[in-house]
Amino acid sequence: MPHSYGYRARTRALFARAFKTNGPVHLSTYLTNFKIGEYVDVVGNAAVHKGMPFKYYHGRTGIVWNVTKRAIGVEINKRVRHRIIKKRIHVRIDHVKKSSCRDSFLKRVKENDKIKHDAHVAKLPVPSTKRLPVLPKAGAIIKSKGQVPETCHAIPYEHLV
């Protein structure tokens, strides 16, 4: 059993920085703009102790609900027994990065809008933009070029003892 149950207990590997990424924080971290409603990833940066999130929130994705001078408010879903609670925390900008969780969705929306616009311009009916599961492969005819196909059967089981 561990001796202490402190705020940062057992976070040696959790907050450890990756190989060759030690040292001061890059300026681009502070120049990033965050808007209310954006998705962000909470990732604790061990180089900056101020405004560091509690270890539970490390690696979680949330939505920005408040922006201040040096920190942003992030709303994160936390499962407590049988229910999910929305937790609102303030985290310094050093410990937050923009999430790429919606990139594929936004790309798909853009492509669908383009398809609909092109159909409208060409005065064609709007095609369905729903994603469909992959269908089974179509049947094919195999040519044997004069060779007779051989029928395979399972070998009957024989008791060898």
UniProtKB/Swiss-Prot annotation:
GO terms for cellular component: ribonucleoprotein complex; ribosome. GO terms for biological process: translation. This is Large ribosomal subunit protein eL21. Keywords: Ribonucleoprotein, Ribosomal protein. InterPro entries: Ribosomal_eL21, Ribosomal_eL21_CS, Ribosomal_eL21_sf, Translation_prot_SH3-like_sf. One of its GO terms (molecular function) is structural constituent of ribosome. Belongs to the eukaryotic ribosomal protein eL21 family. Gene3D superfamilies: 6.10.250.3260, Ribosomal protein L21 (2.30.30.70). PANTHER family: 60S RIBOSOMAL PROTEIN L21. The gene is RPL21.
